[in-house]
């Protein structure tokens, strides 16, 4: 019987939307449940992987930071080889790996993951970007497996109407799921985990 490949969950979204905070929360919630690892993408630094290591998301050997150079979307879409190589290394290092989170570098709304890199794609936008963000569309908003509208606590400060964002998200995504979250308070985290487990067939 062939060993099952790990589920690869891609987390994308613009700079500052809360991707790394989501990755950290997922690691803390799932690291004792699944054999898992993380690959982060940054243009010229390893800031996100260093942040996860400093905050003890997992043991440092399970967190790999890749420096993409140039446009971050190239490393998750047009030429995913640097990420695929990092995944291969992790699979060799940790036998029976079940889950790998791939966090993209911050990019625009047009960035998406290559199907060869990610089995399941979560796309994170934030309320601070304004209530118009969902209606702007783009592959991340319309085609991701789960759209996460983060930082709901900032809505009153930026004058964003969550009801408008909800209606626009429904219109842009059709039947595809989305949810509101606040990664600072872990609001919405349980639903995100349930989605990953159900779609990744960890749970019947």
UniProtKB/Swiss-Prot annotation:
Q: Which domain of life is it from?
A: Bacteria
A GO molecular function term, named singly, is: GTP binding
Any idea which UniProt keywords this protein has? Answer: Chaperone, Cytoplasm, GTP-binding, Nickel insertion, Nucleotide-binding
Localization per Swiss-Prot or TrEMBL: Cytoplasm
Q: Tell me one GO biological process term.
A: urea catabolic process
* Protein function: Facilitates the functional incorporation of the urease nickel metallocenter. This process requires GTP hydrolysis, probably effectuated by UreG.
Q: Which NCBIfam families match?
A: ureG
Q: Which PANTHER family match?
A: UREASE ACCESSORY PROTEIN G (PTHR31715:SF0)
The molecule here is called Urease accessory protein UreG
- Which organism is this entry from? Acinetobacter baylyi (strain ATCC 33305 / BD413 / ADP1)
- Taxon lineage: Bacteria, Pseudomonadati, Pseudomonadota, Gammaproteobacteria, Moraxellales
The coding gene here is ureG
